[in-house]
Amino acid sequence: MKYLLFILSIFFFNFNLKADIWTLEIGSLYSQCKPYQKANFDFEKLSKSNQVKAMLCKTTLVGIANTGYNLCQSLRWYYKSADNDKTKKALIGLSSWYANELVRNQNELIIGFNKWAENNQNFWKKYITGIAFKRDFMAKKYYCDL
């Protein structure tokens, strides 16, 4: 019985881990987002499978955008209370790589991500939560001005 539970736990753990990691890859997220954009962001035009993919796309990108915005707010607070130029430069550096301004239009965020992903296919196996997307797209398009 212990052996069976052990095998089952490995089986479920491995499939869950692979699914979670796969959805975080830029190429995978692009394949989830593009049909949603092609349907002009109308869920009713999508198959059930593509509706699920669209929700994964939207929640992932909005989550990243909101995290970057929260970081921007925190960095602004620290920047105002920084007492030397070295600290201020470090905070500006952090904001230029990881932070972003508030994203007001989620559809524009998805369109921008899709365009960025199409132009940066060399990053498709990288994770969306990594530096490349945050620095090269989010922090530039939605610049966090301290």
Give residue spans per PLM region.
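Compact alpha-helical subdomains of small soluble proteins
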Residues: 21-22, 28-42, 68-146
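N-terminal, post-signal-peptide region of Sec/Tat-exported proteins
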Residues: 44-75
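Short, well-structured alpha-helical interface segments that form or flank functional binding sites
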Residues: 24, 28, 51-59, 133
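Generic hydrophobic secondary-structure signal
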Residues: 4-10, 57, 61-64, 134, ...
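Classical Sec-dependent N-terminal signal peptides that target proteins to the secretory pathway
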Residues: 1-19
